[in-house]
Each structure stands twice: as structure tokens, then as C-alpha cells.
Amino acid sequence: IGFIGTGKITTSVITGLFRSKANLKQILISERSKKNSRALAKRLKQVKVVKDNQEIINRSNWVVLAVVPTVAKKILQDLKFKKGQTVISFVSTLNMKDLRRFASPATLVFKAAPLPMVESKLGPIVLYPSNNKVNALFNKIGTVINAKNEKENNYLWTLTAGMATYLELCATLENWLVQRKVNTAKAKRLVTSLVFGLSHTLLLSKQDTRSLVREYQTKKGINEELLLRLKKDKVFDKINKNLNTIFARIKKANDQ
């Protein structure tokens, strides 16, 4: 398997694959970025840095495209793929039509959206279209969520924009305590335990999430009060509105 582009996501995916003990004899990675590629090659003996992107394609059965969106088309237009190769793109703004055109004559072409936590074998991985072998590989490092079509794929990718916002909420809760002289480590431990407990509840519960929202508040209790205050301030309406804006951006990029 070869990776063209060695940023944070590529580093996380490769780290997760080795932690999952995936049977990969060799992983070829591009030199860009030099810092990440050298660190991976130094840490993992199966990883080899290759200076030329075309050489990665020539030597790989599976090719992962993980370059930044702004240069993706420029890089891909000069590359030649092979019939029978599996080509997987991590590029959010590259639509399937263009991807298939660039990857031709390869016909096994996919879009995937792994997130940084895959290095710990956690988190969703949006994948389109579904394929047993590709699903099996990515299920080793996360939870594959297959989109039924490209429109749904765009919807699912939109939700991945919520990572930093979720962490900002956690940071806000922590900082509220720290500002009131609570020890920083203690504040983080409380918030981390709270988030873990809620995530575990969501994972195991057979109820829909809206039912859990009702269950986790009592009449005239503090959970009900904070939720009602945030609703009155239209916090959740604003999140919904801005998700629509993010979706429009992804859709526009994929329609080009």
C-alpha cells in the first residue's frame, strides 16, 4: 500500500494500522511532509519513504491519496495509475467523477474520511462506495460508516467538521473550573470522565439520542436549566445553520 501525502491523517492511519497488527509487509509514503515521513520511517521499519509519487503508484497495489485539497488536482493530473489497483482518496473536495477520471484505468475507486483518533483505533470512517476488502481494512482502525451515494457521503463528511467544536465545548467546561481555582488536572479528569461516560451510554443505549436528552435532565434541575438557557440563546439552531453552510461548501467543491 502506498500513501501520497504524509500529513496528520496519513500518520494517524498508518499508526492505527500497525497497532491493529494489520498484515502489511510494506508501506510506501511520499516525502511530503518531510518531518512526518521521516518520523514514520524511523519509528516503523515497514515504512519506506519514496521521493517520487509515480514510483509509489508503480510499486503499490493500493494507493491512498492524502494530499491537501488545494493541490490535489494539480498533483493527480501528472500521475498514471494501473488497471487493477485500488485507489482511495482522503481529499474532501475531490468528487467521484474526477477521482475516477484521474485514477483510470483503475476502477476500484473510493472516498474515505478517517479522523485523527484512528491512531488509537477509534472513531468513524466515512467510506463510499462500500467494498468488503476496503471496509475490512478500515474497520481495523475505526468504525466504517458506508454512504449509500455521493450526496449522503457529503452529508456524512459534513459531520466530521464537528470535532474541534466538540473539543472547544470540553475546553470551555474545563476552563470554567480552572478560572475558579480548580486544579487543571482535576478539571480535565472530571470533563474527560463525563465525556467518556456519556459516549459509553450512547454506544450501549438502544434508545434514540433525543430520548437520552430527556432522560438526563430532571424537572427544574440544573441540566434542564442549562439546556433551556442554551436553547433560548439559539445555540443549537446556530450549530444547525452552520452545518448547512459547511455542507454547502463541501457540495460546491464536489460539484465542480
Model-derived regions: residue spans:
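NAD(P)+-binding Rossmann beta1-loop-alpha1 motif at the extreme N-terminus of oxidoreductases
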Residues: 1-51, 55, 178-179
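Internal alpha-helical scaffold of NAD(P)-dependent oxidoreductase catalytic cores
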Residues: 98-108, 122-204, 247-253
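Rossmann-fold dehydrogenase core element
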Residues: 85-89, 99-116
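Short, conserved loop/helix-junction motifs that constitute active-site signature segments
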Residues: 21-23, 78-84, 102-106
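Short, charged/polar "capping" segments at the starts of alpha-helices
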Residues: 34-40, 96-98, 132
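NAD(P)-dependent Rossmann-like dehydrogenase/reductase catalytic/cofactor-binding core
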Residues: 192, 196-256
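Rossmann-like NAD(P)-binding element
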Residues: 35, 47-48, 53-86
